[in-house]
Amino acid sequence: MYSAGLNNYIRFANGKGFGNLHNHMQIMDVEIPVADKHIVVNNTWRRSSIIKMQSIESAGYRCEINQKHETFTAKNTGKPYMEGHHALPMKLQDKFINSLDVYANVICLCPTCHRLLHYGVESEKKNVIDKIYYDRADRLAVCGIKIGKKEFESLIK
C-alpha cells in the first residue's frame, strides 16, 4: 500500500530521477537553518608546491595525456590552466620507503584528464593509466620507486 511512496522517497534520497524535474525544483527553494560546524582532522603527507609547479612548467603547460587538450587561461600564470597529479597518490606513501613527492611521480594534466583519473569509470581510465605507467616507470625506478605494471594498476584504482 505504501510501496510507491517509499520507492519515490528512496529515489529522492538517492538523488535519482531529478533530470526531468528541473521545472519543479523551485518547490524546494525554502529557507534552511545553517547546520552546526564540526571539526574534521585529517593527516596528509606534505606535498611540494615547487615540484608541482615545476612539473607543470616543464610540460610546457600541456596535458601529458594528450597535448592537444585545451583549457582556459589561468589568471595567476597567464598560461593554460593545468593541474599537477601524483601518479602514485601520496596517500600510499606508507607503502614506499622513498618519497612519492618527486618529479617523476607528478604529471601535468588538463582538468578533464585529472577528473577522469579521480572520478572516471575504469574502462575509460585504462588507456590513460597505461600511458602514465609506460611514460613514468623508468623515471620512478631511478627515484627508488620500483613498481610493476600490475601493482601500479592495483594501487591507483
Indicate residue ranges for each PLM-predicted region.
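Hydrophobic/aromatic-lined pockets within catalytic cores
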Residues: 11-14, 67, 71, 118
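Short secondary-structure junctions and interdomain/linker hinges
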Residues: 13-16, 62
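Generic structural hydrophobic/aromatic packing signal, biased to beta-strands
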Residues: 6, 38-39, 84
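A detector for short metal-coordination/catalytic motifs
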Residues: 79-84, 88-157
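Short, charged surface segments at domain edges that flank catalytic/cofactor-binding sites
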Residues: 25-79, 91-101, 152-156
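Hydrophobic alpha-helical segments and helix pairs
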Residues: 16-24
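Non-catalytic DNA-binding core/recognition domains of DNA-processing enzymes
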Residues: 1-13
